[in-house]
Amino acid sequence: HPQDSVGYTNPSAQPYQYLNLYQTFRTRATVTSFRYTGYFQREYVWQRDSVEYTFNGGVRFNYWTLNNQLLISPRAMVSMLPNWKRNVMFRFASGVYYQPPFYKEFRDFNGNTNLNIKAQRSIHFILGGDYEFEAWGRPFKFIGELYYKYMDNVIPYEVDNVRIRYYGTNNAVAYATGIDLKVNGEFVEGTESWISVSVMQTKENLLDDAYYIYLNNEGDTIIPGYTVNNVPTDSIQVTPGWIPRPTDQRVNVGLYFSDYFPNNPNLKMHLTLFFGTGLPFGPPNNHERYKATLRMPPYRRVDIGFSYLLKDAKKEMKRKNVFGHFKNIWLQAQIFNLLQINNTISYLWVEDFTGRQYAVPNYLTSRQLNVKMTFEF
């Protein structure tokens, strides 16, 4: 039987039963358009009271003949470098950004093209800073940023397995806010390592997603496939409001650590760790974004790699030697997903004869070995 049913559709056991497609579309569209773009940018640097200031500003223009929309996007960044004993820099950036839609974004679920669609707009506010310091006699750098982004004319989309389907209309507003922190430096002398932590929240509000809950004469909510009495006698209108966007991954942690063998610095080890909280998901093919509030399991992954410098640019070789034409030659071996963790990428929804659906996870690649050689001229 097909993988999206639990046996009630089985052509081999029911040879005279027709298998009708659940949903079919046949469309044709021809789109011809032209884009005209341009930008202007200027930077100023000046000093006052032993503080160095930098201003970088510009504006970008975009005109698209498809919807006859002229977009003007100003943006600016100001940084301040005080004359302190510690090397610290502060910066603030803001701007208006537009994203004209691609073909898939102005094509709705039924294959119709919306030629009146507008570009999505985002207003950014970013406050950040850099701090360079020394620890254990070695250089390090700390980078931190706080940001808030407000978006309107948003084109919502839903994820069906690994397929992205857009609504084809500007019917939502959204926001994203969070903090990014990163430290990189020589945790081991002569090698670069880093650790990063990010916390983010992004939500959207569809302007036309109100729906009704239907009640039977016993006052119970009618749920097809679950309730016995499915005759509605009353209804309640529900406005979902703000819901998580498909990219709402609350916490992300990454670590990259490199080291080398004390007696052989040409032989190095690289260790990478990733952790991310679960992404939202919901039932498929219902075009009801407010139901996509379930969460996948967290993403966890550990990679390890070893690299050996076979040929060093510092060592001279005879030109007649075939390897003498290369500066460096590296041999690398990597093991991806070392702990063989099953990370969920999407869900396959299986339906039974009552209409109930069950989410079966699809997993990313398991443990994998990769070997490569790198030649540098």
Language-model segment annotations:
Residues H1, G57-F61, V78, F92-V96, ...:
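Transmembrane beta-barrel strands of outer-membrane/channel proteins
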Residues R48-D49, Y148-Y150, N170-P283:
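Gram-negative outer-membrane beta-barrel transporters
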Residues F274-N285, Y308-F377:
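C-terminal beta-signal and adjacent terminal beta-strands/loops
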